[in-house]
């Protein structure tokens, strides 16, 4: 499903139309079957589905004096001496999930199963036993999570509709891990290992969002998720993503947001990545016609950039539901591809047209994606802002990029870009010397500065830094047919040794230089500015 050169898949995230998150407690098999039939008829191929944690593992903690723990129970009933009971899992819910799998198989739908669904749409959902507990770091909670995951995977692994196991929905929202730098790794390792013990045949999907390129910037990071799972995921909503909620939803920056973020995750992680959740977040953010425009842009861009697949959030509107989070969160009520009256929205029609166009044109196989340059994300910068801007600027200049970080072995390329360097670390010495060695062997390197320190610098670039200072105004960049003004973090006074001066400020100080295959610009005018 996720293999290189495979079939680009389309679909959505699914909660039943009649009950949303309460679908397992308010089970209606006929409605679920009708939902899946409607989605299949509109070219939906893949559903991401969620066994809600407290419904599937409804355990309560029973204690004696001084709150000393005695046992877990189903309410007042002891846990049965069965595999399900020992895992704290309700077998009725497992059978309901099995029915969902059967309907999916009937309508040729593939399922991605989010196993630990403890966070959903702005609300926590945990068993009564773990109310008020940090379920990412508490060892007892983790023990029961592992037991549930192993039981569900063991019971459901023979269901042919299941294509992949997902750790859960945005599990990095389920609790803080800042007190222990390895807690995120430990939780991910425990759940992914539990899956693989019971089923090594299917890929393990991260299900996380908002990962960072470096661990120093966030304990949930691309590298460690890629180490422990097979497939990374993006949830690229402009409203919740820095630098993205600036333009109308259907314009260039938002049209490429999902693609840029997914390529960054996949490139830096060096594993497959796909668009697992996306959408406009409803009529408070965008009208139906522009939602359809965004759908088309994400689908065609995702296809062209080898993003493997795209799932919309979500299948059905939930505007008739009274439970939280729908009672709390206005923005969660009208996110579906289908209205409450079962009328398909323009976004679903756009998805259907895209899918049928691929089939009609025999384009289902994901084409190779050529990259012309490597963008190197460095320490002490806003990696997402710099990477996103670099991706867009490259598009405007007519070429495509792949991403790497300054602490990785770099892929071979004829063109490297080290954008918006800032801070005192930037790139470790051994990595910097290896990059300069690539330049000596014929590669081109473009460095843009946001006040960052590189060493050695003067000799390779053929310049001297005379002094630095705090800026008092934007820097002028004046060259052949060009004059623009750029805000900068630090003002650098340069003098050219043997570098060619491509642009200067109003005082004649070089601000853009070239020496052999090295290009340097002191004010990084556009590659971190998204406002």
Annotated model-derived regions:
Residues 331, 343-358, 516-518, 522-531:
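Extracellular ligand-binding/catalytic regions of CAZymes and related secreted enzymes
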Residues 293-325:
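Substrate-binding cleft of secreted/luminal carbohydrate-active enzymes
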Residues 208, 219-252:
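Aromatic- and acid-rich polysaccharide-binding/catalytic face
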Residues 394-410:
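A short, well-structured beta->alpha microelement
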Residues 2-229, 292:
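Active-site mouth of glycoside hydrolases
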Residues 191, 370-397:
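Short, charged N-terminal beta->alpha structural module
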Residues 172-177, 243-245, 261-294:
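Active-site clefts of carbohydrate-active enzymes
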Residues 423-531:
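A conserved amphipathic helix/loop scaffold
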